[in-house]
């Protein structure tokens, strides 16, 4: 609880800016911010990596140390969460498509769940090199997967020999591992959201090469200069990621609802 008390004093110094979480007045916003920071603490977002693994570029976002690990400044987490959500809402309003990437055990479920609920794309098992930079080839493999899944629903499988059925299943499962969440993706996404910088570095590098805006969760061993938009926070916990991705989902839906209203009017 000591960390929360120290953090509460920082809330009074938050800049008065309009964000996706803006309230009717500054006093009301202070109350909301304090509640959010407490919720972030309960979700474990303040828990950084081992101090010996830290990246000095993350110093502005670190509050201190505790039992050999860095403690992330949750006021910074809140401010950057607001900025990211405003960006996602704006991009959704423009009609941009989103790709969620998280291939670790604790991030896989969060990424898939958020992508499905926002009608977005996802990669949650393994990132295949060239998935974006060599999209022409990747797209052919996506089509192949769709074709195999279609055949699976017919009587075609019954006509195959045991070996042919095994080969069919092996190819289908291999393609599902890489492309299941990309089955409806016809072109490159407008924004890529990464559950972790270090764990999803290959995907991040492809975004940089293609100049696709990226949103990344940064732990204390990450490099903030590599990401277009980022949020300092614990990237090693399902609970922490689920907390942040819930706000991503709401921001995207808010932007799309605004776009729909503009279309109707």
From Swiss-Prot:
InterPro entries assigned to the protein according to its UniProt record, in alphabetical order: Ribosomal_uS2, Ribosomal_uS2_bac/mit/plastid, Ribosomal_uS2_flav_dom_sf
Entry's Gene Ontology molecular function annotations: structural constituent of ribosome
GO cellular component, one term: mitochondrial small ribosomal subunit
Keywords: Chloroplast, Plastid, Ribonucleoprotein, Ribosomal protein
BP-aspect Gene Ontology terms: translation
CDD domains from the UniProt entry: RPS2 (cd01425)
Name of the protein in its database record: Small ribosomal subunit protein uS2c
Originating gene: rps2
């Amino acid at each position: 609880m000591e960390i929360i008390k120290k953090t509460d004093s920082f809330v009074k110094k938050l800049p008065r800016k309009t964000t996706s979480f803006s309230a009717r007045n500054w006093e009301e916003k202070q109350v909301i911010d304090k509640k959010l920071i407490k919720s972030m603490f309960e979700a474990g977002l303040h828990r950084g990596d081992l101090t010996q693994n830290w990246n000095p570029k993350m110093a502005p976002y670190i509050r201190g140390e505790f039992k050999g690990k860095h403690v992330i400044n949750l006021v910074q987490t809140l401010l950057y969460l607001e900025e990211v959500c405003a960006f996602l809402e704006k991009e959704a309003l423009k009609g941009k498509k989103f790709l969620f990437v998280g291939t670790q055990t604790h991030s896989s479920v969060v990424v898939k769940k958020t992508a499905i609920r926002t009608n977005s794309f996802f990669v949650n098992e393994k990132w295949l090199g060239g998935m974006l930079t060599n999209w022409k080839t990747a797209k052919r493999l996506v089509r192949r997967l769709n074709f195999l899944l279609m055949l699976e629903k017919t009587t075609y499988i019954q006509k195959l020999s045991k070996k042919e059925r095994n080969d069919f299943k092996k190819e289908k499962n291999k393609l599902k591992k890489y492309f299941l969440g990309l089955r409806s993706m016809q072109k490159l996404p407008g924004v890529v959201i990464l559950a972790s910088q270090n764990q999803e570095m290959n995907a991040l590098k492809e975004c940089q090469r293609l100049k696709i805006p990226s949103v990344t969760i940064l732990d204390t061993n990450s490099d903030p200069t590599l990401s277009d938009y980022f949020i300092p926070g614990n990237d090693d916990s399902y609970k922490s990621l689920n907390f942040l991705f819930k706000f991503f989902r709401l921001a995207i839906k808010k932007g799309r609802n605004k776009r729909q209203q503009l279309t109707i009017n």
